[in-house]
């Protein structure tokens, strides 16, 4: 049976957030007559690989572009980060509305971003006036698509992330062959959910959450599953997205005779992931799938695990580590798909702002770059 652990940090001074014990955000503001103006959370050079030039443009090094910039008919205003805090995400959206009254589209690249954007638009009375493009299958986002408040969302297949992670790790732990591409990238397709297919998609999600998801196809039918293997699936946070991945792990357990410990760090910190890995190693773990929070600073941690067991990265990659391969979405192509939704919503062009949790995370960089290069009409 799958074991699910939520890693909770001790909070001081009575501060708490929406999940676990993350400190509650204090939205900064500046005085503007009698109006309190929300201030956006912008990347700093040390925090998110961004640096502000003398011209005022911000160079997002992980993304590869200085913003704001013109992209054909579109003007990409910037990328707002929120440190995985939904309250800060809403503050960012509010600040963007005030700073850019003529903004035409807001693109949220992590699951909680579209609901935060919608909340800001609701407060401002601008639902329907500004287009919203999302990412992932947050229930509020799906409902908003049904209600005509969101253009669409790009969805991954976390259910398959869980199932295939267990399949491959169980085989590798037993020294059985897994076909790994030369580039060490095993992609699981993404799709676009719009008003045309949202009801069908929601019905499938409900089936998965009820434990009635379809059994995915395995790569092989001749796996030796004689001995039970002990695996760990570590996420980067607590989110409905990861509940779907957990359901995939549960579906895979009896198929591949595996015991899977699904760990969801409540605060989404590197320290929590490190603690979980060390505990898993000490308890005789045999295979690890992880979504790295800060890949550049987690190489040693991942290598420590890879020295004693097979390790793969899922959802977000750490390509400089000794992980065997990456399993998940092509985040760049998914970003381009989000850019295509922007084009459909704004065929005449307009101003676009991108919102995401942390630009230190590789999937955030790749999705952002995909959106930008699609709006630029850069060849794929």
Q: Where are each of the predicted segments found?
A:
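Bacterial N-terminal signal peptides that target proteins for export
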Residues: 1-8
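Bacterial N-terminal signal peptides
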Residues: 9-17
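A residue-level marker of the well-folded mature domains of exported/periplasmic proteins
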Residues: 21-380
């Amino acid at each position: 049976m799958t074991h699910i652990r939520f890693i909770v940090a001790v909070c001081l001074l009575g501060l708490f957030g929406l999940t676990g014990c993350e400190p509650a955000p204090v939205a900064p503001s500046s005085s503007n007559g009698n109006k309190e103006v929300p201030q956006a959370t912008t990347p700093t050079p040390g925090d998110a690989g961004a640096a502000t030039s003398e011209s005022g443009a911000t160079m997002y090094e992980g993304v590869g572009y200085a913003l704001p910039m013109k992209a054909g008919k579109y003007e990409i205003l910037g990328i707002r980060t929120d440190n995985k805090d939904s309250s800060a995400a809403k503050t960012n959206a509010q600040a963007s509305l005030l700073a850019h009254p003529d903004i035409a589209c807001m693109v949220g690249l992590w699951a909680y971003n579209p609901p935060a954007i919608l909340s800001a638009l609701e407060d401002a009375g601008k639902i329907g006036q500004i287009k919203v493009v999302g990412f992932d299958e947050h229930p509020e986002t799906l409902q908003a698509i049904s209600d005509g408040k969101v253009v669409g969302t790009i969805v991954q297949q976390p259910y398959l992330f869980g199932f295939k992670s267990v399949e491959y790790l169980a085989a590798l732990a037993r020294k059985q062959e897994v076909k790994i591409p030369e580039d060490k990238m095993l992609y699981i397709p993404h799709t676009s959910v719009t008003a045309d297919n949202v009801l069908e998609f929601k019905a499938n999600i409900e089936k998965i959450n009820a434990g009635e998801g379809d059994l995915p196809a395995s790569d092989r039918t001749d796996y030796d599953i004689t001995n039970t293997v002990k695996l760990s699936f570590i996420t980067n946070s607590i989110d409905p997205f990861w509940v779907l991945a957990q359901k995939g792990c549960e579906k895979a357990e009896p198929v591949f005779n595996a015991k899977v410990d699904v760990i969801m760090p409540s605060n989404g910190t590197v320290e929590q992931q490190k603690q979980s890995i060390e505990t898993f190693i000490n308890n005789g773990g045999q295979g690890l799938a992880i979504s790295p929070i800060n890949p550049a600073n987690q190489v040693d941690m991942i290598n420590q695990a890879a020295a004693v067991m097979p390790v793969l990265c899922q959802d977000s990659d750490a390509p400089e580590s000794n992980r065997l391969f990456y399993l998940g979405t092509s985040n760049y192509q998914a970003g381009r798909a989000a850019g295509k939704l922007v084009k459909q919503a704004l065929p005449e062009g307009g101003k676009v702002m991108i919102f995401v949790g942390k630009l230190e995370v590789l999937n955030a960089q790749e999705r952002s770059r995909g959106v930008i290069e699609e709006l630029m009409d850069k060849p794929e």
